[in-house]
Structure formats: C-alpha cells, structure tokens
C-alpha cells in the first residue's frame, strides 16, 4: 500500500499487480490503464483496510505499525481519492462525500487513543533521534546504527542534504519563498496573500516558530548545537550562494550525534516519519470542513490544537 501510494502520487496512472506468482512472460502485458483512477485508489485503500483488520491495537515491538497506523494511511488514501479528477490536466471534477466520511471514520480519536498517539509537546521532537517512535510518530520507516552490520540500516537517502561544511552536498535547499511562507501577523496567523511581497527579516518580522526547526538559517546554531553556527558563505552553501544560504535542517541530525556515520556522504539512524499524529488531526479537519455538515467548529478546534503546539515550540 505504501509503495503504490507513493507511485500514485508521482505518476497518477500506475501498474497495480496483486498476483505474486505472475510469470515473467506476462509482465509485458501489464498496463497502467487496467483500472480507472478511482479504482486504483480503491485498490490501495483495500491494502490498508486489510492491515487495519489484521494489525493489533498496540505493538509490543517498538516501531512496528499498529492498527492506528493502518487507519491513518487508510484515511489519507480516501482523502486523496475524494478529490475526483479528470483529463491530463488533473481538473477537479468533484469531491466525493462518501470518501470524506471514510476519512472521518478512520481518524476517529478513539482509534488513535488505543494506540497511545498524540502530539509531542514540542514540534522539534519529531525530528530528533532521542525522541524517535514517540507519541506523534504514527508510522515511520525505521533506521539503525551499530546493529551488527557494516553500515547498519542507515538512512542514506538524506546523504546529500547536509551543508557543504558537514559532508555533502547541500542539496534539498530551502527556498526564499519557503522561508517567507512562515511569516505571520502579530496574532500568529499566516499572511496568505502578502507573505512573499518582501523577503523575511529575522530582526523585524513575526514568524511561525516551526521555521527554525525546518530551515537552517545563517547566524543560528545548526540542529541546536552552538558549536556549529551557520554562516552565509561558500563553506556552508554550494555554488557560491547561487541557490541562497539557507540549509536543510529537519531531516538531518546534530553533527556530534552518535547516530551518525561520517564519510564522503553522511548517513544517520534518524527515522523517517511517514505519518504523524498532527497529519491525522489535519486530515480529519479537512474532511469535516469539506463535508460541511455542522462540524466546522470541531474542525477549527483540531487545527488550533496543532497551531497551539506550534506556537509553543521554542525548544
């Protein structure tokens, strides 16, 4: 289900094969139009439904997906499926209420409570190895180090995103537009229509605190380590600042962390969270808003729960 979901996000029309005993000669007969767009989403949902029906409410071994993880991914699938599209330009043709009701069903707080899920007290805790598999991590891809193998089951996927001075190769750089999008008014509300009129100024502009957990900014410690102050120079950023001087932060770790294997490329044992509890709250809120059946206040409450945690995330 996870693999098919990612493929569908990227390519829309995908090949779905459920026959694990298919003969190689039959591969050339496969088509990405065997099923309609809606049918493909339903096939993916069916996989997560099977997981939901068969997984335990709580896993004894840390990191394994429980029933709530399947429910969350099932809800996410139905949320994507609800927005019906047509044509090569992906024109929205309608929003399916039955799919939205499934989103509400599988984001039920009781399901999440049985799994012990909730928001972390600080947003940053989702991206620090010492808090892995915490309350907010509904499902994550697990990584490890020093597990008896040469390189461990490390996350090499982020090996090119560390700043130039700390390995290689300063890819996945945050844009100025992204930084500007974190600007807020004096009440902490987003500047939807004017955020990009002028570039963010740290000394004068109000900003969502999540910026400092997402983007490494010149003058600030890298991953909260004051031994590594980000500089606006070629040592930290590639191509002489052609792509700016912000650096990727969220998916990387403290350079002094024992979870890190250094070399030409750096890799760490930091898990990659696929679905957080905050995602579950916001998916439920979106479905309630689109259904417009008298529960808008409930949706606003869910959104404010996430926003309130963000406002206090100054760790």
Where are these regions (language model features)?
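Short amphipathic alpha-helical coiled-coil/interface segments
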Residues: 1, 74, 103, 107, ...
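Aromatic-anchored glycine-rich loop motif in surface-exposed flexible loops
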Residues: 2-67, 78-98, 246-275, 284-315
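An aromatic- and glycine-enriched ligand-binding surface/loop that stacks and positions planar moieties
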Residues: 49-50, 64-69, 76-238
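Surface-exposed, extracytoplasmic segments of Gram-negative outer-membrane nutrient-acquisition systems
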Residues: 216, 220-265, 302
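Conserved, function-defining core regions and hallmark residues within catalytic/recognition domains
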Residues: 278
């Amino acid at each position: 289900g996870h693999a098919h979901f990612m493929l569908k996000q990227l390519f829309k029309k995908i090949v779905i094969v459920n026959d694990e005993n298919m003969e190689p000669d039959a591969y050339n007969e496969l088509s990405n139009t065997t099923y309609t767009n809606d049918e493909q989403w339903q096939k993916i949902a069916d996989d997560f439904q099977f997981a939901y029906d068969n997984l335990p409410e709580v896993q004894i071994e840390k990191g394994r997906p429980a029933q709530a993880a399947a429910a969350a991914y099932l809800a996410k699938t139905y949320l994507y499926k609800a927005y019906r599209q047509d044509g090569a330009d992906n024109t929205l043709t309608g929003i399916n209420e039955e799919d939205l009701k499934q989103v509400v069903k599988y984001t039920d707080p009781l399901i999440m409570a049985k799994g012990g899920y909730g928001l972390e007290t600080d947003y940053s805790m989702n991206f620090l190895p010492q808090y892995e598999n915490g309350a907010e991590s509904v499902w994550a891809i697990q990584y490890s180090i020093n597990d008896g193998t040469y390189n461990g089951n490390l996350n090499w996927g982020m090996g090119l995103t560390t700043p130039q001075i700390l390995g290689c190769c300063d890819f996945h750089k945050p844009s100025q537009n992204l930084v500007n999008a974190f600007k807020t008014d004096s009440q902490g509300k987003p500047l939807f229509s004017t955020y990009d009129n002028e570039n963010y100024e740290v000394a004068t502009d109000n900003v969502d605190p999540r910026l400092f957990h997402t983007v490494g900014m010149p003058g600030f410690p890298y991953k909260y380590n004051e031994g590594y102050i980000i500089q606006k120079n070629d040592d930290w950023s590639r191509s002489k600042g052609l792509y700016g001087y912000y650096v990727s932060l969220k998916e990387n770790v403290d350079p002094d962390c024992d979870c890190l294997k250094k070399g030409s490329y750096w890799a760490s044992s930091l898990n990659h969270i696929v679905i957080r509890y905050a995602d579950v709250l916001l998916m439920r809120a979106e479905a309630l808003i689109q259904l417009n059946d008298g529960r808008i206040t409930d949706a606003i409450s869910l959104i404010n729960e996430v926003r309130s945690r963000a406002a206090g995330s100054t760790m």
